[in-house]
């Protein structure tokens, strides 16, 4: 499955994927790269999931992401939602607050794949 996501990465540029992220998250935010600090609180990844299936998100469980504990909770929730949607997730929760660029890129590819049914 990771090879599948790597094929998506190969067929799309980072700019294409970031464009989709920015399209989904407008007007609140604009990310410049997959190591953008705005990914650190997990809220952007949750918002990407809501673009696929809005009813899956319980916004009462999403924290402001201001503390390390909030970031951990949001990251775990984002991963949980992605798995419920059917994504194969390779990252662990602490890849998100640590801004592991490669893992966040693969997570976004998984969400992109679900949204546009590339498989």
List each language-model region with its residue ranges.
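Alpha-helical coiled-coil scaffolding segments
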Residues: 1-119
